[in-house]
Amino acid sequence: MTRMISTGVGSLAVRVRGQGPTAVLWHSLFVDERSWGRVEDELATERRVVSVTGPGHGASDDPGRRYTLAECAAAAGTILDELGVDEPVDWIGNAWGGHIGIVFATDAAPRCRTLVTLGTPVRALNRTERARTVFLLAAHRMLGPVGFIRSGVTNVLLSAATRKRDPEAVALVGDCLVRAGRAALRNAVVSISLHRPDLTDRLPGLSVPTLFVTGSDHKGWTPEQARAASRLVPQGSCAVVDGAAYLVPLEAPAETTDLVRRFWSASVPEYP
C-alpha cells in the first residue's frame, strides 16, 4: 500500500508492507524507492516495512526551498506518527537514507532501535566530489538527464562489476533520473549533497546498535573509512560487500538481507 503523507519537506510517498516490528527504509539520492525492490520482499517477511520516497524523487513532492537532513529526519517522525507507530524502529538507509538515519537516531533516539547505513559517507563532500557534483548539476540544468549525465551518475552509484553484469540495475538508475522532476532533483542534490555537513561528531552520540555497510568499490566511503567510523560508535560495527559501490541493496541484495538479519539477530533480543 502506498499513500501520500504531508510533512515539513512536502508530501511524501510512503509504501507499507508486511507485519511485525517497524523497519524504515530511505533510499539514496538520484534513485527512488524502487532501489529497495530486491530486498523489500525478504525484509517484509519479518518486519512491517515502511519505505519512504524522499523529496524530489519518485512521486514525492519538492518543498520548493532548500531543506536539511534534520528536516528529513523530522519528516520521518511525522510519517511514523501518521502511521500510528509508537515503538522504536529499525532504520535502514542507503547513502542519503543513512545520513538521515544518523540524524534521526541522535535527535530522536527513543524512536530508533537499530541503525543500518548502506554506502553512507559520514564526512562532507571533498573538493573533487563537490566540483563533480556542481558540474553535473549545471549540465543537468541545461540539458536534462541526457546520456553522459546518466552515465556519470551510474558510474558513481554502481560498481564496474555491477554495470557489466547487471543491465537491470543500470536501467533502473537511468529511469529514476529520467522520471525525477528536474528542478526538484537538483534541489535535493544541492540541499542534501552540496550542503551536507560532516556527521562525524554525531557518531559518539549514537546510543543504538549501528552497522556501517559499504561496498568494496565505493570510492567515496572506503572500507577503511567505514571501519574508522564504526569505532566511534559505542555499539558500532562494520561490514564490506565485495563488488558493490553506493547502491548496496540494489547491487548485492542477498548479501544485504543476510547482513541485516544477522545484525538484527545480534542486536535485538526478541528478534525476529
Describe each model-derived feature in a short phrase:
Residues 10-65:
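Conserved HGGG/HGGXW glycine-rich cap/lid loop of the alpha/beta-hydrolase fold
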Residues 41, 50-92, 258:
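Active-site loop/oxyanion-hole signature of alpha/beta-hydrolase fold enzymes
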Residues 93, 97, 101:
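Gly/Ala-rich beta-loop-alpha elbow adjacent to hydrolase catalytic centers
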Residues 106-107, 112-143:
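Flexible "cap/lid" loop of the alpha/beta hydrolase fold
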Residues 126-130, 146-204:
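Conserved alpha/beta-hydrolase catalytic His-Asp/Glu region
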Residues 206, 212-214:
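Short beta-strand/loop motif that positions the catalytic acidic residue
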Residues 219-225:
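Conserved alpha/beta-hydrolase "acid-adjacent" motif
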Residues 235-272:
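Catalytic active-site module of serine/aspartate enzymes centered on a nucleophile-bearing elbow/loop
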